[in-house]
Curated annotation (Swiss-Prot):
The gene is MTP5. GO terms for cellular component: membrane; vacuolar membrane. Involved in sequestration of excess metal in the cytoplasm into vacuoles to maintain metal homeostasis. The chain crosses the membrane at residues 125-145, 151-171, 193-213, 233-253, 269-291, 294-313. This is Metal tolerance protein 5. Residues 146-150, 214-232, 292-293 are vacuolar. It comes from the Eukaryota.
Length: 415
């Protein structure tokens, strides 16, 4: 029996998988009353006896700036070995999670009451963010009028887009809460990345307009920018108050795992940065040189364009059907193989993004003599098991009796 997976893996992981197959195929013996139970589970992959040495686990390097910036070239032989064992530990933890799903039929998680409580908290975070954005936008409009600073105006326009983003994200959240199985058969979860994508595109476009206005100001021969003492007092007080409120919202929204609330947290964090840059640029332009103000506005605009361009790319990847990581495909393959002893072969395992969650396609081979009713029940149970995973929105299980055929679907991507 063999398994073919749509993805790759480490050579050591393949050897570990092969060892587990051998252990599962030949390790079904036992003594006494436990012999029957052991024989019943002997067809399953079993990694209980595979554990990396404790000394290797203790020596694993942290995955931080050192790992990502300097890369493999900066690692010695001991670091590479420790990293390898760390990958093995993570793989085994994933397999244990799949074993829990197989044995219990569900993954330990929050109860219905706990989920409702979290949903209410997320709604409160969104409402607080929208109310704060409206109040702070009005305050920054006043600061812009009092100062005339291009940098502060750029920061105020960013707050205007906060209101727009709040409306877009609220609309997507509301749309997902009102399902229509006839008009939207697979749900509306694509509304979430699509709303973020639209907002990010608007942010990047406005940043370009700010750059053009700042360049025009630098090239003009007008009077240099300067704040009076009264203007300076108002601007500093307003901008510092706005920054402190935004910082508190960052810390609050980052306690949630919901993608929309996390988008608000990111938005509030950007506001903290832009508010400080705008204030510093206005003060430096007053006390040093007037050209610092439009330069600060250009810096804010470039920062806005870069940040939201990265957000656009991230959400585009989630919408175009990017494959899951090889490690995740390994977990799914492990789950499929241990699902039922009648599974003779795993032809295909695919997982790809279709919004914020995965769609999964699995092809398994069952005996050709198996009755249709039994084969259907095995496939349906596997589908339900896959859809219990929190990362998966929908799973499709295809049943077959052989695996030497051509692909069933038209491979339009190969034309």
């Amino acid at each position: 029996m063999a398994a073919a997976v749509a993805g790759g893996g480490e050579e050591g992981e393949e050897l570990l998988l092969l060892s587990a197959v051998e252990a599962g195929s030949f390790g079904g013996g036992g003594d006494g009353g436990g012999a029957g139970a052991a024989a019943e589970k002997s067809w399953r992959l079993n990694f209980d006896g595979f554990r990396p040495p404790e000394v290797q686990q203790e020596r694993r390097p942290p995955r931080g700036l050192h790992h990502h910036c300097l890369g493999v070239l900066s690692q010695g032989p001991e670091d590479v070995v420790a990293e390898y064992y760390q990958q093995q530990v993570e793989m085994l933890e994933g397999f244990n999670e799949m074993d829990t799903l197989t044995d219990r039929g569900f993954l330990p998680g929050m109860s219905k009451e706990e989920r409702e409580k979290v949903a209410r908290s997320e709604t409160l975070a969104i409402r607080l963010s929208n109310i704060a954005n409206m109040v702070l936008f009005a305050a920054k409009v006043y600061a812009s009028v009092r100062s005339g600073s291009l940098a502060i105006i750029a920061s105020t326009l960013d707050s205007l887009l906060d209101l727009l983003s709040g409306f877009i994200l609220w609309f997507t959240a509301f749309s997902m809460q009102t399902p229509n199985p006839y008009r939207y058969p697979i749900g509306k979860k694509r509304m979430q990345p699509l709303g973020i994508l639209v907002f990010a595109s608007v942010m990047a476009t406005l940043g370009l307009q700010i750059i053009l206005e700042s360049v025009r100001s630098l090239l003009s021969d007008g009077d240099e920018f300067s704040l009076t003492k009264e203007q300076e007092k108002w601007v500093v007080d307003i901008m510092l108050a706005v920054t402190l409120v935004k910082l508190a919202l960052v810390l609050y929204c980052r306690t949630f795992t919901n993608e929309i609330v996390k988008a608000y947290a990111q938005d509030h964090f950007f506001d903290v940065i832009t508010n400080m840059i705008g204030l510093v640029a206005a003060l430096l332009a007053t006390y040093i040189e007037g050209w610092i103000d439009p330069v600060g506005a250009i810096i804010l605009a470039i920062y806005t364009i870069r940040t939201w361009s990265m957000t656009v790319l991230e959400n585009v990847h989630s919408l175009v059907g990017q494959s899951a990581s090889p490690e995740y495909l390994q977990k799914l393959t492990y789950l499929c193989w241990n699902h039922h002893k009648a599974v003779r072969h795993i032809d295909t395992v695919r997982a790809y993004t279709f919004g914020s969650h995965y769609f999964v396609e699995v092809d398994i081979v069952l005996p050709s003599s198996m009755p249709l009713q039994e084969a259907h029940d095995i496939g349906e149970a596997l589908q339900e098991k896959l859809e219990r995973l929190p990362e998966i929105e929908r799973a499709f299980v295809h049943l077959d009796y052989e695996f030497t055929h051509r692909p069933e679907h038209a491979l339009s991507h190969e034309k």
